[in-house]
Amino acid sequence: MNWHVLAQLTVLAFVIAVGPITLIWLSNKKDALL
């Protein structure tokens, strides 16, 4: 497998995993600030 493809898949998986967590964290922060 090309390492560029592997890197893209890793980044994609990372974004999919961290995205929702970041959104939840940001919404919690917003609620705390307000």
Curated annotation (Swiss-Prot):
<dbReference type="GO" id="GO:0009535">
    <property type="term" value="C:chloroplast thylakoid membrane"/>
</dbReference>
<comment type="similarity">
    <text>Belongs to the Psb30/Ycf12 family.</text>
</comment>
<keyword id="KW-0150">Chloroplast</keyword>
<keyword id="KW-0602">Photosynthesis</keyword>
<dbReference type="Pfam" id="PF05969">
    <property type="entry name" value="PSII_Ycf12"/>
</dbReference>
<comment type="subunit">
    <text>PSII is composed of 1 copy each of membrane proteins PsbA, PsbB, PsbC, PsbD, PsbE, PsbF, PsbH, PsbI, PsbJ, PsbK, PsbL, PsbM, PsbT, PsbX, PsbY, PsbZ, Psb30/Ycf12, peripheral proteins of the oxygen-evolving complex and a large number of cofactors. It forms dimeric complexes.</text>
</comment>
<keyword id="KW-0472">Membrane</keyword>
<keyword id="KW-1133">Transmembrane helix</keyword>
<dbReference type="GO" id="GO:0015979">
    <property type="term" value="P:photosynthesis"/>
</dbReference>
<dbReference type="GO" id="GO:0009523">
    <property type="term" value="C:photosystem II"/>
</dbReference>
<keyword id="KW-0812">Transmembrane</keyword>
<feature type="transmembrane region" description="Helical">
    <location>
        <begin position="5"/>
        <end position="25"/>
    </location>
</feature>
<keyword id="KW-0604">Photosystem II</keyword>
<comment type="function">
    <text>A core subunit of photosystem II (PSII), probably helps stabilize the reaction center.</text>
</comment>
<protein>
    <recommendedName>
        <fullName>Photosystem II reaction center protein Psb30</fullName>
    </recommendedName>
</protein>
<keyword id="KW-0934">Plastid</keyword>
<keyword id="KW-0793">Thylakoid</keyword>
<dbReference type="InterPro" id="IPR010284">
    <property type="entry name" value="PSII_Ycf12_core-subunit"/>
</dbReference>
